[in-house]
Amino acid sequence: MRTIYLIRHGKPEFPDEQKYCIGRTDLPLSEEGRTQIRALGETFAGRRIEKIYTSPLKRCRESAAILQEVIDRSIPIEVMDGLAEIDMGEWDGHSFDEIREQFPAEYAARGADMYDFRPPQGESFADCARRARTTWNELRMKSRGDILVIGHAGWFRTLICGWEKRKKAELLQIPFGYGQVYEKKDFVFDALISAAGRSSRMGDFKPLMKLGTQTVLEREIQTLRACGVHEITIITGRRAEDIRAAAVGTGIHFIHNPAYAETKMFDSVCLGLSYYKEKRKTAGKETLDGIFFFPVDVPLFTPFTLEYEKYRFAEGDGDVYLPEYEKTPGHPLLIRADVIEKLLQHDGTMGLKGACEQPEIRRIPLDVPDPGCAFDADTQEEFQKLRDWERKRPIPDREECERLLAWFHTPEATVRHSRAVAELTVELADRVLKHRSETYVEMTYKSPPIDKHKIYAAALLHDIAKAYPEHPETGAGWLRLLGHTGIADIVADHMDLPEEKLGYLNESLIVYLADKQVQGERRVTIEERFAAKREKFKDNPEALAGVERRYQLAKRAEALL
């Protein structure tokens, strides 16, 4: 395991003693800031740092240069634009007194919704968080050892807020002073794909068959990359050159099994494991913690399965993690790198399954809510089933929704509420569709299609993460990882509908409104729903203001129906 050090730049040179909004304002370090960073650099003496990544802003680049000079001048520095601080738009460079005076309405709106508020021509913290997650994954995959990341408090806080499962409202409470360090432990995972089979029963070449617009192999590589897998090793056999040509991109390694026609899959697996054994020996054990393994004909596992395996891997209770869907074995396996040598000592009986069942190997079966992990294809008929499932996956059916509610241990009261909301969404949708048919409304962006199956599924799962902080976005995140992309945004919107979706009838608005009209399992009016909350927060002016804001939004949505 390696450590990634998040380091806030030193104190900048401010124009005066006022408090300024300096998101992208390019201030240099102050003398105090340079002293802070130099002292920090001394604490890294003797540590092996592979690389320094820095924001393009001057205060960070200067901090990075000082750290390089103090720690080791041979450490490379890379500037990443994605590390830049949150863009405060027209507010940038102004004092907060000036902002309050020039933008009174916007400043008040910011106070009511700090996380999602977007200053004129700028970013919200939600925008910054999305950019931060993308950049974080990029920089993680650029290196394998300990690294320094020099950046900004706002950018770092959006990541830490998610890592520590904090509420959005707590974002600015996360301490991150000038020159402060946050240590993030990080496992390094690679992947091994066995693509040396002959595809004899398929009558085609499985790695290069199309699933939608992508080949099987392209889909698998995309999923691995989305989960921060570093190097992908592909064992080739038949049509090796075609696979090399198709698997484009950095961090892809090929090992050819010249005897693929006479050997079994375990022989190909051993070629890959032997490669990783030698790699750890030369580069150091800390450069590789685990290996995802799967045969190339299992392309529909989702990022959720990989992330869940990584989560369980971090608990340290197993050596091989084996996903399964409703008792059906699936892929990828996650193999702890420390047991590579033991697996290689196996005599080959029962292949990799037999190697993993050695008594010294701790096997951990993992039930996952991902049918795709258990779908493989050896014939054209089986491959067509993969295509059918891939087409249907964005919108889960009722049976799959109920399975998800059970897997995530959603409380029974919440499940009953969700079913009641789902039934109401269908009634509201029928009302909208009936009105459209009677008035011959043309489909436009202001009157988009209403899919009853989609809103029913979204309503059934809207509170799937109710027991977790920021449950709308948490639940939507789970659904995106599972490939249920058709309903994820609706789930994310169900508590606070974005302003841009309040001007016309749409699927998010219908689910949002149905949720506001069901209390427990009982249907209520908007007024009834908010009366209890007004009473609850009557002595808390700030919370009461939030209740009133949500009430007004709900009434605007109701007026559209």
Please place each PLM-identified region on the residue numbering.
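Conserved beta-loop-beta/alpha segment of the NTase-like Rossmann-fold superfamily
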Residues: 261-341
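Domain-level recognition of soluble alpha/beta enzyme cores
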Residues: 166-186
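Loop-to-helix element that buttresses phosphate recognition and phosphoryl-transfer chemistry
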Residues: 11-62, 119-133
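Divalent metal-dependent catalytic cores for phosphoryl transfer on phosphate-bearing substrates
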Residues: 444-537
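Acidic/His-rich, divalent-metal-binding segments that scaffold phosphate/diphosphate chemistry
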Residues: 388-471, 481, 522
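Phosphate-coordination/substrate-recognition cap region in phosphate-metabolizing enzymes
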Residues: 39-107
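Conserved alpha/beta core of the MobA/IspD/sugar-nucleotide pyrophosphorylase nucleotidyltransferase superfamily
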Residues: 341, 347-399
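N-terminal glycine-rich phosphate-binding loop and ensuing alpha1 helix
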Residues: 190-237
